[in-house]
Amino acid sequence: MSAMRTDSRVLLVIADSSRSGGPEHVLTLAQELSAAGSSPLVACPPGELVERCRELGVAVSSLSMRGRGWASAPVRLRQLSRRWQASVVHSHGLRAGTLLRRARTGAPQVHSHHLDGWFTASPLRVAIHRHELRVLCRAAQLQIAVSNAVAEFLTDEVGADSRRVRVIANGIHPLPAVPRTAPDGRRVGVLARLTQSKGVDIAILALATPAGRSLTLNIGGAGPELAALVDLAFTVGVADRVNFLGEVRDREQFFAGCDLAWVPSRAEPFGLVACEAMSSGLPVVASRVGGLTEILDPPLAGLVVMPANPAALASVSAGLLDDPERYAALSAAGPERVRRRFSSTRMGVLTRGVYREVTGL
């Protein structure tokens, strides 16, 4: 594929500045666009994403998109787009997409969807979100779904026009691959924001099952469920085998200290952490939800179990750790699959192709 013209200018908008999947994706995409000769500008709320953009030399503008900022954000985004002379505006997530739609920048809008479900039990909230998504899908020239699971949600639940949906998997900068011929121990790692949807409680409960009694668990990440997870570890009698490590800055080092990665999410539209672990050569066992099955291609590059099933998670993992041949095969397969399907370079090329579709550049 040919590259975009070197003078193409892109405004990337996201309403989240945390160190989670969406902001990580936007930062990686901005780096890929810059490397290809485009000029990206990230617009996001104050927070860690702003700081990381500045550290990496990515142009960034900080603006509030909640509270009082909700009302003023469309005007500020329109001004920002015009000052940047954006040839395309690209929103990520419903809040950013809605604000950018209301901004009426005059530039074609691409919107990336990062959810494959409603994530609320309230019928009223579902109805509101469905309406907002339908309006957004009509307003944006093209939609990007980060997995087939997200694309199916858009067409089946939201009613999006499948002809205007492009599936582009999130991409990562692969970690250095260290092939493993056998596990050094029985250390399992979970790297996630500590929220209910990530299923970290399932990982803790897995240690209390018969198959999990020989396992130790390293938990990297922060979030609102920390206290409840610590209490759970004591309640089920596994606190001596659970290490809460807090925010992890060096993911390569984290994975090097594990023999297996778990991604026990209850819902996962994509699953960047699975890609990161696989790229390092660390075998992965994950929930059979959302984009995780697409990433792992079980049983070739990873293993999956039914979600919210601690016994199955522990049993499958113990079996893998006791099978050096299969363990080594998964360790070897992971980096190659990430290189072919989930690299940041591939994501950047395909995303620039979408920009060409809507701009003609």
Please report, for each region that a protein language model flagged, where it lies by residue.
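N-terminal strand-loop element at the rim of the active site
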Residues: 12-72, 223
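Short His-centered aromatic/hydrophobic patch
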Residues: 91-97, 113
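A conserved mid-protein helix/loop that constitutes part of the nucleotide-sugar donor-binding site
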Residues: 20-31, 186, 190-209, 224-230, ...
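Conserved acidic donor-binding segment of nucleotide-sugar-dependent glycosyltransferases
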Residues: 298-310, 319-324
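Aromatic "clamp/platform" in nucleotide-sugar-dependent glycosyltransferases that forms part
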Residues: 247, 266
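Nucleotide-sugar donor phosphate/pyrophosphate-binding loop at the beta->alpha transition
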Residues: 71-75, 108, 117-139
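Short hydrophobic beta-strand element within catalytic cores of glycosyltransferases
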Residues: 283-286, 296
